Amino acid sequence: MKKNLIHFVEWKRIPENKIFSVMEEVRSWGVKDIVFHPCFFKEDDYSYVRKIREYMEDAGLKSSACHALWGKGNDCVTTDADEWKNMIGKHKKFLDLLSEVGVKTYTYHLGAAHEEKWENIASTVRKSVDALLPCCERNNIILALENSGETPDLIRKMSNFVAGYSHPYLGMCFDSGHANCYQDGIRETLEVMRENIVTCHLHDNNGTFDDHNPPGEGNTSWEELDTLLDTLPRLLHAETESGDWGEEAWHSFCRVLKKN
């Protein structure tokens, strides 16, 4: 893969007093770019994002990608009016803070149930995207809608929505593990999304459960995926996203994506 590879670290499991030392360790593996974690957004302390940015700078790291706040009350398909307003407000504040970090993509979950139909959520998705895109544009960050646990039909319609919206600050995040276990497979799902993929979440599984394994611990054809990634017209970078984010896992990703 010719584009930059960004490494995911599960920062929410790391004590505050260990964050900087872990950043230094990760940098010693050859990592230069890390995924900015949503746990760094604290509603009672907005300055914490700046603190983390300073840690990264001191460790010789940068962050070009961020996973949006996610889960109940944070996802795109939030139907309660007050909850939706609060959700949009949080994302806007986080995006404003991320502009100081240098983040370029912000991956956003739909939050739809697996069997949900696009027609039932389309208006809410559009409403949320409409609300966030001006903030994304102001901060030069692309909003990337992710294929999560939804059906292949919904992913096709979401992809058509993004294509029809045709906005430079709206794209898609292709999650290879989700494609492998929830949709029609990696190649097939990537082809559906290909024209507007701006970032990727890469991890492995055997096609039956969303394990978030490093390469080699599943049935993903990494050689094929590596080739496919270089054909994506809007791809800015790709992100590792395995639960095992240690040094061996990092080097496994580098090996299969020819980053060594």
Give the positions of each predicted feature.
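Charged helix-capping and loop-helix junction motifs
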Residues: 47-51, 83-91, 119-130, 159, ...
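A short acidic, helix-capping loop that chelates divalent metal ions and anchors anionic groups
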Residues: 72-79, 112-119, 181-182, 207-213
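Histidine-acidic metal/acid-base catalytic patches
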Residues: 1-4, 10, 16-30, 57, ...
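Short beta-strand segments at enzyme active-site cores
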Residues: 36, 64-68, 103-110, 143-145, ...
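Non-cysteine beta-strand/loop elements that form the S-adenosyl-L-methionine
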Residues: 63-69, 108, 196-206
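Flexible loop residues that form catalytic
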Residues: 39, 71, 111, 205, ...
